[in-house]
């Protein structure tokens, strides 16, 4: 399911019915994934980050929506962009200086990210698709990178770790948080070899 943008809980439930009509008789319940567009501060074609504490007006109750999806017979999944977050309560030192995204090398920022994953899983979502982390960390898409991916003039909070170690630490924390709820992880715009064993699926694309 790949349908980001304008959506609503009603549209998700209608699409759930359609998905079930295509999978009638299948013993393994399909996943129905809510893509970008559900989050509180979503602004179409402008902003697709957090906070990830609640849905917007078209998604008034994310926990109830997951329950309705389960009642229909699918396994609820959801999309998140964990590092882009405009919550004004987040301290500046938790952010990467060159773009303002969360810096997972900072222990408190990493804990904040983990809490977001735990919250979403606690609502009843059994699949987490985390997206954009490579771009949000390094400011480049896959086709733009080379052997030197980092721009000059900035650094992560923890200067004692390499970029690869920081990326893997992020993947590990997401995986541990989701595993407490037996949730499946899809990586999107992730670095494949660093995510080995820490993602159940890796969406092909610009990673």
Task: Annotate each PLM feature.
Residues 1-18, 22-31, 35-40:
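An acidic-aromatic substrate-binding cleft motif
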Residues 28-207:
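Aromatic- and carboxylate-enriched substrate-binding clefts and catalytic-loop regions
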């Amino acid at each position: 399911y790949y349908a980001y943008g304008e959506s609503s809980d009603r549209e998700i439930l209608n699409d759930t019915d359609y998905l079930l009509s295509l999978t009638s008789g299948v013993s393994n319940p399909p996943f129905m994934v809510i893509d970008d567009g559900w989050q509180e501060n979503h602004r179409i074609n402008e902003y697709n980050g957090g906070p990830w504490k609640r849905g917007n007006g078209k998604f008034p109750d994310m926990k109830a929506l997951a329950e309705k999806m389960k009642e229909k017979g699918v396994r609820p999944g959801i999309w998140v962009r964990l590092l882009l977050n405009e919550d004004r309560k987040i301290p500046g030192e938790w952010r990467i200086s060159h773009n303002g995204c969360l810096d997972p090398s900072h222990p408190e920022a990493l804990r904040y990210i983990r809490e977001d994953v735990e919250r979403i899983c606690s609502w009843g979502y059994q699949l987490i698709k985390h997206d954009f982390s490579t771009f949000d960390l390094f400011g480049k898409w896959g086709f733009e990178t080379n052997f030197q991916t980092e721009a000059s003039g900035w650094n992560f909070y923890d200067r004692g770790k390499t970029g690869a170690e920081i990326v893997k630490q992020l993947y590990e924390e997401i995986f541990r948080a989701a595993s407490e709820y037996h949730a499946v992880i899809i990586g999107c715009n992730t670095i494949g070899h660093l995510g080995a064993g820490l993602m159940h699926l890796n969406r092909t694309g610009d990673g």
